[in-house]
């Protein structure tokens, strides 16, 4: 299948908490909205593209924990192909708590890195990359470089 956008990411689970303003130290603040959602820079871009009608696929790895399974289901819910999303057995997925401040429109993020190893060059499905119109990257590691080289040779635009 040809995709409009293929993205390589280490997806995480975001717990988004929206408040009117951040509390003072030792203070409190009422939560206005909260949600669980798949996160990561590339993952967020893929969801936005899919909502606009693009055919998208995610390549990467998550843990086999409940957070990783949630991320996979969230991609599927948004119509994003997960055939290239690896589940690392017995490993955990990263978690971010995103605190959004309505008053300043700012945010603060606290996170826990999971133990799931990134996708390796040997695991990278190059055909998915070569058959895309665009390749979306957020990290500059050996997997991203390998994917970018293959994409360029195939005439795929990289961003």
What is each residue range found by the language model?
Residues 89-91:
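Short, glycine-/polar-rich solvent-exposed loops and beta-turns at beta-strand/coil boundaries
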Residues 93-98:
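Short alpha-helix plus adjacent loop in nuclease-associated cores
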Residues 1-61, 66-70, 77:
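Glycine-rich phosphate/adenosyl-contacting loop at the front of the ribokinase-like
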Residues 1-11, 61, 74-87, 99-159:
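Ribokinase/PfkB-type carbohydrate-kinase core domain
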């Amino acid at each position: 299948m040809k995709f409009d956008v293929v993205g390589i990411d280490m997806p995480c689970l975001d717990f988004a908490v929206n408040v009117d303003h951040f509390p003072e130290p030792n203070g409190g603040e009422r939560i206005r909205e909260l949600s669980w959602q798949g996160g990561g820079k590339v993952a967020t871009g893929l969801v936005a593209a899919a909502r606009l009608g693009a055919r998208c696929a995610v390549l990467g790895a998550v843990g086999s924990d409940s957070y990783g399974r949630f991320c996979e289901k969230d991609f599927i819910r948004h119509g994003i192909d997960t055939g290239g999303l690896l589940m690392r057995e017995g490993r955990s997925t990263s978690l971010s708590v995103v605190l959004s401040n309505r008053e300043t429109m700012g945010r603060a993020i606290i996170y826990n890195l999971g133990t799931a190893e990134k996708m390796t060059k040997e695991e990278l499905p190059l055909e998915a990359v070569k058959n895309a119109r665009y390749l979306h990257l957020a990290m500059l590691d050996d997997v991203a470089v390998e994917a970018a080289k293959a994409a360029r040779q195939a005439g795929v635009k990289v961003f």
